[in-house]
Amino acid sequence: VREIVVHDWQARAGIDVAALAAFLGRALGVDASPVSGGAGMRPDGAGGALGACRVADVKRPFWRQRGEAPRDGGVALYDGHELLRLALAVAGPGASPRGALHVMVTDLLVGTYDDADARYHARPVVASNPSLLSTASAVWGPARSRRYYGEAMAARASGGDGAAVEAAHAAEHLVEGDARMAAAIRGYAMQAAMYALTGEAFCDDDSCCLHDAHWQSGVLSAVASGQLCAAHGAAIGGLT
């Protein structure tokens, strides 16, 4: 990877792509630059192609539901692999293994289908070239604490104050518009970059920003730290 280009695909995402590019450039010792505007990700800028990426049924793989209308209600979920096809068109011919790594930041909820449990899961990062980073998926993908879910269920069952439960646990997980989102996205961007450099995005060390955190606590303690473990720090040093 000679260069990293960070694209703002959605102005509402609230991520400073210039700051993100600068972080990646410093961390990896490569040239990095931002591209703002995001026209390629808005429905009016995608020629209707964006709507064709929307998931109609979270319990079926995309190829079995292609062309079906999404069910009414709920948050729109988009297939990550289909979005990558759009991203490739936005990024241009330089988005190749021998060219620049293009990192696309969006606030769309992005997911991929998992054959292991036959359903879609929200993915904060879909590592490829281009790679996708989703702020919405960083909120809704990693699980919140068991205590939070228990208290939220109890509040619903009793007609209690769900807002009070949210407030009590606000520090434990990311929410939309969270000031900690920029740090989390930096960690996910490092995962995308590591995949481009080595073919492996994740780390088993739960203190490393490359850790594949399935819980919000791990996102905040590891991914958002921006810190590499000793092994990956050395690996980056040897690659750049």
Residue ranges and their predicted role:
Residues 13-34:
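Zn2+-dependent metallopeptidase catalytic core
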Residues 9, 35-38:
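Conserved beta-strand termini and adjacent loop/short-helix elements that scaffold enzyme active sites
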Residues 1-14, 103:
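Short hydrophobic beta-strand segments
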Residues 4-6, 24, 133:
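Hydrophobic beta-strand residues in large extracellular and virion-surface proteins
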Residues 38-204, 212-213:
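Metzincin-family zinc-dependent endopeptidase catalytic domain
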